[in-house]
Amino acid sequence: MAAARHSTLDFMLGAKADGETILKGLQSIFQEQGMTESVHTWQDHGYLATYINKNGSFANLRIYPHGLVLLDLQSYDGDAQGKEVDSLLNKVEERMKELSQDSTERVKRLPPIVRGGAIDRYWPTADGRLVEYDIDKVVYDEDSPYQNIKILHSKQFGNILILSGDVNLAESDLAYTRAIMGSGKEDYSGKDVLILGGGDGGILCEIVKLKPKMVTMVEIDQMVIDGCKKYMRKTCGDVLDNLKGDCYQVLIEDCIPVLKRYAKEGREFDYVINDLTAVPISTSPEEDSTWEFLRLILDLSMKVLKQDGKYFTQGNCVNLTEALSLYEEQLGRLYCPVEFSKEIVCVPSYLELWVFYTVWKKAKP
């Protein structure tokens, strides 16, 4: 698959830098490449020069009157064109040093962005920053009735599970699993545990080691389990090979009817672990259906949680303070009064600090 390589080079010059001098000084570099020039001039807004090559590559040179100079180049992502672009950028950078006469305040050359490649390496963080992962292979890519399921291989993080474009868990992310289980502070031996979601098998694998009485995991998507038991074995071990074990069972069902059924039956758990979804980024809880789903899960979970039990869940990126505050407000609106604590954890593949919550019912007077 042919991909496009987008390279950038930025200069911040002193306010007295002359745009016309810079434009004329750089023209010869592009002309040497056989590129066709087109220049647009605005009296108060500087210059825009476009250079087009016969091989389909092109460059935009934008010179602002306050000293900002931006160069954007697009080319095919091939070795030959990549070397040509690097050479061109080097020449522009050297020429700019000559033209600016030491008035350059800042030079910024970012790694090129490859667009439209066979492997997508770019995934935004929860707070909207762009991250390029060191993905070198698509391990698994299938559409289930519920979502797109990708497992991609990272040189640093191992295989990464990505659900509908959202980075879920990598083989490196034991820190996530430990945090959503209480960070090693809980005694699971002889306890009844309910896991909501968790199709990667990480939580189930770790809890089974702690000799619980019974773990019930409710996962709606069989295809997530199928992909993870084959390609995420460093995370799940062999617990997903069978849907039933000595101390666990996996139900392939929607968790909401299951929670309602358990609540009606009066069934209770020592621990409920919600691994379904992060706190929504939206700050309109009355309008966003994800918030409605989250509130429903919270209320139903409290109904099946023992009075002295604990509810664990992920929050979101530590920078999303407004969304996290809204989540904490929702905790105050449940059918029963609760208290909570939170912990900030570094999950390797997330490349951002992540908040985890522990919720418990207030003691009865």
From Swiss-Prot:
Residues 121-361 form the PABS domain. Transmembrane segments: none annotated. The modification N-acetylalanine is found at residue 2. The modification Phosphoserine is found at residue 57. It catalyses: S-adenosyl 3-(methylsulfanyl)propylamine + spermidine = spermine + S-methyl-5'-thioadenosine + H(+). Keywords: Acetylation, Phosphoprotein, Polyamine biosynthesis, Transferase. One of its GO terms (molecular function) is spermine synthase activity. It comes from the Eukaryota. Spermidine binds at residues 176, 200, 350, 352. Pathway: Amine and polyamine biosynthesis; spermine biosynthesis; spermine from spermidine: step 1/1. Catalyzes the production of spermine from spermidine and decarboxylated S-adenosylmethionine (dcSAM). This is Spermine synthase. It comes from Bos taurus.
